[in-house]
Structure formats: C-alpha cells, structure tokens
Amino acid sequence: MNANTPVTIVMIEDDEGHARLIERNIRRSGVNNEIIPFSNGTDAMKHLFGSDGTGIQHKGRALLILLDLNLPDMTGIDILRQIKENKYLKTAPVVVLTTTDDSQEIKRCYELGCNVYITKPVNYESFANAIRQLGLFFSVIQVPPACSS
C-alpha cells in the first residue's frame, strides 16, 4: 500500500436507513472513496476473506471498515476478532458504529483492535472528524517495501 492507493470503505450495517445516513455523512465530510455496503456479516466476511478464506486478495489494499455490532446473522465482535487475527486485514482501521453504549462492550472492542467506537445515533461532527482523521492516517502512512534476499 502506498499513499496513492485509494481507500475502499467496507460498510457492514444491517439497517438500511442507518446505512444511507452513514454514507450521506461520509459524503458530506468530503470523502468520495468507493463504499461497498453489506447488510449482514456473512456477505461481508465472504468479501473480506474471499473464496479461499485467507483474505489475501486484500494484501496491499487500503481498507476502512465501518462495523455495526448488532447484525442479524453474527455479532460484530466476532467479525472484528476475525479481521484483527488475519494477517492481511489486521492493519485495516475499524470504526464500530452501534447503538450499544455499554462500557464493557466498548472496552472489549478496543481490546480487540477497533480504532474508533461511535454510538448511534451518530453525531455528525464526531463521525466526520473520525473519518477525516483516518483519511489523514492513510495519507501519511508509508509501508516500507519488503526486503529482497
């Protein structure tokens, strides 16, 4: 991944109204990157991990994952854990967007590796600021090339 690699936003949100609002807020904050929406965890996991289950197709790609914790088919916690345990996906920033403001769940998400935890309904300014900060992160990060032997 380099500074010219466009960031793809993967949005995992089962509520269609929330998904539209999130996308609108992203666009209002000036972000025009591709957004790939998923309404359930199963389809999102197939996309993230691919048909072989390794996630290798995302090697070198810049991803930003927006994750709801309350999905119809699996928990966002399980998705977060699997993303952060995968060698190709673990560096992708994960923004948790959920209605749950339980302090234990928030702590657990941060322990598993989420980068930002935002409680719905989303405060537009907080959300836009988080997205802008993550965009800045992507624009300044440089991954050193692999050493050849």
Residue ranges and their predicted role:
Residues 115:
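Short, glycine/charged-rich "phosphate-handling" switch motifs in NTP-dependent
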Residues 1-10, 15-36, 40-49, 54-63, ...:
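Non-catalytic signal-transmission and effector/linker regions of two-component phosphorelay proteins
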Residues 56-60, 84-91, 112:
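Conserved phosphotransfer cores of two-component systems
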Residues 72, 102:
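The feature encodes the CheY-like receiver
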Residues 120:
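A Lys-centered signature of the CheY-like receiver
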Residues 67-68, 98:
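Active-site residues of response regulator receiver
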